[in-house]
Amino acid sequence: MSTMKVDFYFDPKAGLADAQSSAARAARLGYDGFFTAETSHEPFFPLVLASQVTPDLTLGTAIAVAFPRSPMTMAQIAWDLSQASEGKLILGLGTQVKAHIVRRFSGEWFSPGPRMRDYIAALRAIWNTFQTGAPLKYEGDFYKFSLMTPFFNPGPINHPDIPVAIAGVGPYMARLAGEVCQGFHVHPFHTVKYLDEVVIPRMSEGAKVAGRVLSDVDRISTVMIVTGKDEAEIEAGKAAVRAQIAFYASTPDYLSVLETHGWDIGERLSSLARQGEWAEMGSLISDEMLHEVAVVAPFDSLGQAIRDRYGDRLQRVGYYSLQTTMEWPEEIWRDLVSDTRG
């Protein structure tokens, strides 16, 4: 079993004022990386601040929404961050879903998988022009770039080969990651069975098409956890995780996870969600489902439990906790990170 890297996920509700202190805390506790998400705040600004105080941490987006931004805009942001972090950036990209792209970003939604493939190829063409000064000539199915003058070219940097990781749930994105990416962000609503039967085989197929091997692409994910110092604390933490599992399971985008296990509750949960019956939804999540999706263990054995479950299935993990985790003493976190890494 290889060493697992452990990443700190910046609280998506936190503001920029907390970015440097959170990154410093992550470094102090022994984390390998500092990741941000694009939810209620922009994902790149915290990484800029973190790069100034934690030079040893890998920095990454998990994820930034690709389609509202031109590949040119994304290429420039990533270029500057790679330079600021001395090559420690992992650019994590996601498609989001149609409702958000159309109604929240006022964008257009079409062919998300093939469009993401084109997006990544465009990024790399732009980066090549930045680094070499070669004329920019990219003609893809969705994106076309043909103008780059010296005034707008940022010029070469020391770490131009920026790793790209994409997020996804279904087979297409897993296959695409295996073919053209350096990482794949596995959604936290997953199980070992789903990894073994869907994600990893599709990634292997993609890697083979490109003449690569599976180990060329890291699998990255947050892992839902339920923990505590005793059984009472663990039991108290289960309700919130059941509710979160129910929320994901009610969404058609994640139906493939349910189908892998033969869990026939998706339609019922979707109906309850439409009615706003959130409390009842959590009660439909069985103990079997809870333990398949989440790692349930006390503090002192949680790290080993994560390693036992995932082995070489995941190369980078973060903790997805719905408990009051920031109140736990730092020594607990330090030991957990060390135990998880192995």
In which residue ranges do the predicted regions lie?
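Active-site-adjacent structural elements that line small-molecule/cofactor binding pockets in enzymes
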Residues: 1-342
